[in-house]
UniProtKB/Swiss-Prot annotation:
This is Chorismate synthase. Belongs to the chorismate synthase family. FMN binds at R125, S126, S127, G285, K300, P301, T302, P303, S304, R327. Pfam families: Chorismate_synt. NADP(+) binds at R48. It comes from the Archaea. The lineage of its organism: Archaea, Methanobacteriati, Methanobacteriota, Stenosarchaea group, Methanomicrobia. Its cofactor is FMNH2. This reaction introduces a second double bond into the aromatic ring system. Keywords: Amino-acid biosynthesis, Aromatic amino acid biosynthesis, FAD, Flavoprotein, FMN, Lyase, NADP. PROSITE patterns: CHORISMATE_SYNTHASE_1 (PS00787), CHORISMATE_SYNTHASE_2 (PS00788), CHORISMATE_SYNTHASE_3 (PS00789). It comes from Methanosarcina barkeri (strain Fusaro / DSM 804). Its EC number is 4.2.3.5. Reduced FMN (FMNH(2)).
Length: 365
């Protein structure tokens, strides 16, 4: 299986399966001289850890990270950073009943079509548990970017038909962890919690939209034509399980606007070139403008639901039905926020190194 590596100069390789012994990541390209510890990584992993609230799976995993290489006396050495997390609460027997019946909305059928076999225990490699490696690698990317004044704020903008009101970057950072649904509009968050609770009782699930704001990115970041910054952000977010759509700035709304409405007029502010609006979402021609980069990912409802669904029996090739049991998230967006933040951090860190905005030697000066 290929496709386990992401990035060019700042590169991660994730490994492991949902019900295997462990999952982890190898990070290549982290410059020498960055102070970090297991606590820095653990802080991010704890944000995506299951079993913490009524909006996540009841699977209980400590998700304690172990750093195996790439660090000496509390600093990165410039060599590969290898990290792992042991799986401890996998209940594989719950998945025996679906061994020969592909779950609607899951990768069961497509993995069989591609590889001729699949690990049916929790989805194997296609499980969202793979994202532990992304979050661990992204934690290092976020630490690196913070040294250069780049910060990332993610939150749940929509859950089903419920949408948060417009909020500032600072409000998102302040409020996002105050509620299990990670919606920074606390009034909307309460309604979202009620909706999730009702759907859980019904054996159903709900999707939503995760919004990300990246602040502090300098103008001039990006590698046209095929390595456009927005294209790489789209790939990063679309690679996350359950993501079905991506937009940046005005996004699909841009198709409904006139040019006079969509264009962001240039002006001088405090001696610097800026724009009076940001419909472009901080990127023009695949290159950053210096304004906030604003992008969103559309997340489908959790496909594992308790309702009876139509499927097929792979052995008999007959139609049948399935009602999925086990421990599953009633909604994905809240736990996806730290994963999405990690992925965009990896993209920005990679481009900062590729463009020369980060000189690997400067961390030691």
């Amino acid at each position: 299986m290929a496709g386990n590596v992401f990035g060019q100069m700042f590169r991660i390789t994730t490994w492991g399966e949902s019900h295997g012994k462990a999952v982890g990541v190898v990070v290549d390209g982290l410059p020498a001289g960055l102070p970090f510890s297991e606590a820095d990584i653990q802080k991010e992993l704890d944000r995506r850890r299951p079993g913490q609230s009524e909006v996540s799976t009841p699977r209980h995993e400590a998700d304690r990270v172990e750093i195996l290489s790439g660090i000496f006396e509390g600093m990165s050495t410039g060599t590969p950073v290898s990290m792992l997390v042991w799986n401890s609460d996998a209940r594989s027997s719950a998945y025996d009943v679906i061994k020969d019946t592909p779950r609607p909305g899951h990768a069961d059928f497509t993995y069989m079509a591609r590889y001729g076999m699949r690990d049916h225990r929790g989805g194997g490699r296609s499980s969202a548990r793979e994202t532990i490696g992304r979050v661990a690698g992204g934690a290092l990317a976020k630490l690196l970017l913070s040294r250069f004044g780049i910060l990332i704020a993610g939150h749940v903008l929509e859950l089903g038909a419920l949408r948060a009101k417009p909020l500032s970057f600072e409000e998102i950072l302040e409020n996002v962890e105050k509620t299990p649904v990670r919606c920074a509009d606390l009034e909307a968050a309460e309604k979202m919690l009620e909706k999730v609770a009702a759907l859980r009782q019904e054996g159903d699930s709900i999707g939503g939209i995760v919004e990300l704001i990246i602040r502090g990115v300098p103008a001039g970041l990006g590698e046209p034509v095929f390595d456009r910054l927005d294209a790489d952000l789209a790939k990063a977010l679309m690679s996350i399980p359950a993501v079905k759509g991506f937009e940046i700035g005005a996004g699909f709304e841009a198709a409904r606007l006139y040019g006079s409405e969509m264009n962001d007029p240039f002006r001088i502010k405090e001696g610097k070139i800026t724009t009076s609006s940001n419909n472009a979402g901080g990127i023009l021609g695949g290159i950053s403008t210096g304004l906030d980069i604003v992008c969103r990912a559309a997340v489908k409802p959790t496909p594992s639901i308790g309702k009876v669904q139509q499927t097929v029996d792979l052995k008999t090739l007959e139609n049948t039905e399935i009602a999925i049991k086990g421990r599953h998230d009633p909604t994905i967006p809240p736990r996806m926020v730290p994963v999405a933040e990690a992925m965009v951090a990896l993209v920005i860190a990679d481009h900062m190194l590729r463009s020369g905005f980060i000189n690997p030697r400067t961390l030691l000066e």
